Amino acid sequence: MSRLNINFLGKELKNNVITSSGCFGFGEEYSNYFDVNELGAVNLKGITLNKKDGNKGTRIAETPSGMINCIGLENPGIEYFKDNIIKNIKYSTPIILNINGATIDEYVKVAEIANEIERVDFVELNISCPNVKNGGMAFGASCESAESTTKAVKKVLSKKPLIVKLSPNVTDIASIAKAVEDAGADSVSLVNTFLSMKIDTKTRKPLLGNIFGGLSGACIRPIAVRMVYQVYKAVKIPIVGMGGITNYNDALEFILAGASLVSIGAGIFSNPILPIEVINGIDNYLKENNISNIKDIIGAAHL
């Protein structure tokens, strides 16, 4: 058995390195850079019930050690995805489908369709979306809304393990993680992007078309690692850790803090083969330190 093999929610993965939703398209786009089958899993671009064109205006802004994006969940919708895209995916790597909604009813409808797509191995529930029936507050902004959304989706998701992606824009992320665990989540992934903005000093206006966007990149990593550490102490379900990973050592920090899987996001944009470098780096680390399997160091930083 490989040092990197890991059983995640009943599925055997060849390693614990995956890609983040929104940074890897549907996977095929990166096949010219490396063999996607080398990844532990692929997390696909976020899907909604109906097609979304995304936000107008500028969508991406560079910032020191990171980037701000407000793509607006541009995607073809779950039905088109089911009937066209998923059928044409050639790689055999396990797939995580990231689902989104503007209401709990929308989440449930997307989950019902995802539940019947055989090629999808896991569903990731993105609760950072704004709840249009609750003044735009994100579904993951409180324990109550996070729990009710998770419970509703879990009820119809009978064939797939449920990962809940947590927002970092909260006061106590550990309490929210515990709430979604109690609601039936099989795993939590964290962190999503941090709410931020950039102002164009020439026009004296917000640079992004949506005014606010999500900050990602190396600048958020220390905060993300801290949050993974806190959540690991609060829940018993496995954690997918992410936020600013640019090399294998960054990934190891998340693993030592308590992440079973690590997810590579914005770092791919500047280094398309980063996931493979991280896989090889972790493997060498385990070999050099005589560690038989990656699971032996998950959460090892806890005293």
UniProtKB/Swiss-Prot annotation:
Pfam families given in the database record: DHO_dh
GO molecular-function term, one example from the UniProt record: dihydroorotate dehydrogenase (NAD+) activity
UniProt pathway: Pyrimidine metabolism; UMP biosynthesis via de novo pathway; orotate from (S)-dihydroorotate (NAD(+) route): step 1/1
Required co-factors: FMN
One BP annotation, GO: 'de novo' pyrimidine nucleobase biosynthetic process
UniProt-listed Gene3D superfamilies: Aldolase class I (3.20.20.70)
Family to which this protein belongs: Belongs to the dihydroorotate dehydrogenase family. Type 1 subfamily.
Subunit field text: Heterotetramer of 2 PyrK and 2 PyrD type B subunits.
Name recorded for this polypeptide: Dihydroorotate dehydrogenase B (NAD(+)), catalytic subunit
Lineage of origin: Bacteria, Pseudomonadati, Spirochaetota, Spirochaetia, Brachyspirales
